[in-house]
Amino acid sequence: MNMKFYYENIDFKNVSNGYPFCHISNLDWNYGFSNPIFELNDVEPIIWNFSIIGEMNSQVVDANKDYLESVFDKVKDKPNIKIVFSNFHEGTNQNPFFSRLILFKDKFNLATNQIVVVTNNKHSELFNKHGIKVIHKPYLFGFLVDHYRDIKHTSIDYKGTEIGLLNVNQYLESEKKKFFLTYNKNTTKTFRIQLILWLIKNGLIDDSYVSILIKNNNFNKRELDSNEIELNGLAEYYDEFDKIGFNVLDWDYPNHKNDVFSNLKYTTKSHYADTYFNIITETSFENNSLNLTEKSFKAFANCHPFLIIGDMDTHKYLQSLGFELYDDLIDYSFDSMPDNQKRLNDALGQIRKVHKLGINSIINFYKNNIEKIKKNKERFFEYSFSKMIDDTIKELHI
């Protein structure tokens, strides 16, 4: 029997289910709009989808509790209807969101897997054992790949800036201007500030391309310090960080939030050509989340050595996606440390080690790993956001 998408509004192509906290998404465009239904029944397989705007967190549930309870009440005796919450772009710690859904499931006595969550967060798969069906795929990664296909072989020019992807020969042939590259759009996050303070403390800030686009002082500066070796005394350098102000590499976010460089495709090729190593700071840095955004994958497409400061088991997850790590350069034992401060400390220790190896050692490492680096780039382009959406729709039908 053909699966249908239930829509609350006759004007469903313009007004989403759950508006205004939800919007129309790829599930609608790729399937739902061609298979709509406007009345619920207890026979046909029906999807009632809510594509959440922003993070899937407890606040969005609490703010719309009465409405959501009315939704669950309508399907409590109809196991053929699946309530789906989907988000392909935001996936930071979703545990409180799932806790709310479990309460709803129990209150309305819903069937196992009648609630479905479609998410970018790998860690959320743990909630399958609580009767919530979790469909996880690296959607943001796939979204990046589909954008990068346009510049895979041919660069484009934007006001004198080359937008394109670096290859291994260009990495080796390009004259380097800095050792590190690190994009840090939002430096209100403690772990990103700690990285920049660490670069300042160790005299590496001037040998790094560092973007700083969002700042504020709404946090406890004492959280910047730790007894861990690499993190000790970082707060002393906060004033220097504050004096830096904003630092724009290409996307002038402070003045133009919708600048062309906000588009995923617009990658400044020279940033990768001019540097030896990429320090990637992910969106989240948790031990109960595993949310990789496009940030973790750009280095593969640009043939650039890297280390990610992110959620626990981030690098392990990359391996599960078919990428090879650089074990002859980096000790990844920090990756599985549940203590966030210890994980950050040891990651910084590895970054220090990479810098101490020196330029010649990094180039030799690169030459010895060219086939691996090429293979990772090929693996990158084997993924596709559109295929992930098609596979998701198939899984919803099961």
List the model feature ranges, each with a label.
Residues N2-I280, E286-T293, F300-I398:
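Pol beta-like nucleotidyltransferase catalytic core
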